[in-house]
Each structure stands twice: as C-alpha cells, then as structure tokens.
Amino acid sequence: MIDPPMDRIKVSGLYAITPDIENIDRLCEMAYHVLAGGVSWLQYRNKKANSRLRLMQALEIHLLCKQFQVPLIINDHMDLVMEIDAEGLHVGGEDTSVAAARHYLGRNKIIGVSCYNQLSHAIEAEKAGADYVAFGAFYPSMTKVDAYQAPIHLLDAAKKTLNIPIVAIGGINLDNAEALIARGCDAVAVSQALFSAQDIQSAARHFSKLFC
C-alpha cells in the first residue's frame, strides 16, 4: 500500500462540485457564494468546456479558493492540476488510474476516486495511494442521470474496511444528507442542490452546519 503524506488535509465536510456553465463571470460568482457559505472543498468539473475555457475558469476559481483557503480539486484533467498548481485531482472509474495519477502528480497532490457502488474498487484505490474515495449515486442525480446506484448500507461496510475518507455523492440535498452523514461518510459532494439554489451561500451554510 502507498501511504499518503500524513500532513495532508483530510477530506471532510461539504464538498461542492461546479456545474457545466460556460460563462466565467457567472460561474465565479456562484463559486464565490459557495465558498463564502463555508464549503470545505471545491471540485472544478465542466464536461462541456474546451481546454482553453477549462484553463481560464480553473485559474479564476483557484484564485477564489485561495482567498478562502479552500482546496481546489480538478476533475479528470491531470495536466490542468499541474498547470494551475491545484491541490488535487478527482478521477472516475474509467479515467486515469490512481497509480498513473500519483506517478504524474507526485506525493504532494490529493487524489480522489469515484468508486460508484463497488467497495472492491475502493479497496484497490486505497492500496494504490488514493487520498479519498467517493461512493454513489445514493439518490437520483440531476447532474448524472445515468449514474450507478449505491445502497446506503455500502457506507457501513466502507467505514469498517477503509482507512481513508469517504465521500457520498449523487442526488444529495438538505433533506437526505443527514442520513448519509449518520452512516459514516466524511463528506457529502453536492452540485445541483447548491448551485441551483435561490440563495447559494445560504444553502452552503446549511449543508456545512450538518457537520458541526
């Protein structure tokens, strides 16, 4: 097993994931309100953007994250992590392997992995040096309508088996997040329920209070 550096910040609390928005000003405004609301982690994810737009958006969002001292995780793109010196990378089950990502990024970057509903995948990811794993979707997701469905009792087994933080994802809102936290997840990853809220900052604040 590859041990991550012990001084690395542990993933916990509210983990926000940006929506597929092309307008930089609008996206940054939304990110600002999420950060001001107390989000602990922010993942930049934009499946519709080209490489130039991704770079421009990620640079601006990283500046905001630095103001609030919140780590920025980049979805999928290792080169973008290095180009803007983001704090970490999140990879999906069919993306770059943890071992390849760790070799490319080195030991000082955070690496998270989507494990869907597969505990065995999470065990292998931990052995390969992942800093956290994400399970879900636990509820129907508006962001990924074809997402794998994960049973809530998976969190019980994961908590007993893994030694790295566990993130719950998929259709999470203020009505169902507490049930996941009670089952032992360290963080909840939220996109739709945050960025589509009428008051983004207030929504982020309410999610964050669930961990207090």
Curated annotation (Swiss-Prot):
It catalyses: 2-[(2R,5Z)-2-carboxy-4-methylthiazol-5(2H)-ylidene]ethyl phosphate + 4-amino-2-methyl-5-(diphosphooxymethyl)pyrimidine + 2 H(+) = thiamine phosphate + CO2 + diphosphate; 2-(2-carboxy-4-methylthiazol-5-yl)ethyl phosphate + 4-amino-2-methyl-5-(diphosphooxymethyl)pyrimidine + 2 H(+) = thiamine phosphate + CO2 + diphosphate; 4-methyl-5-(2-phosphooxyethyl)-thiazole + 4-amino-2-methyl-5-(diphosphooxymethyl)pyrimidine + H(+) = thiamine phosphate + diphosphate. GO terms for biological process: thiamine biosynthetic process; thiamine diphosphate biosynthetic process. 4-amino-2-methyl-5-(diphosphooxymethyl)pyrimidine binds at residues 43-47, 75, 114, 144. 2-[(2R,5Z)-2-carboxy-4-methylthiazol-5(2H)-ylidene]ethyl phosphate binds at residues 141-143, 171. GO terms for cellular component: cytoplasm. Binds 1 Mg(2+) ion per subunit. Belongs to the thiamine-phosphate synthase family. This is Thiamine-phosphate synthase. It comes from Nitrosomonas eutropha (strain DSM 101675 / C91 / Nm57). The lineage of its organism: Bacteria, Pseudomonadati, Pseudomonadota, Betaproteobacteria, Nitrosomonadales.
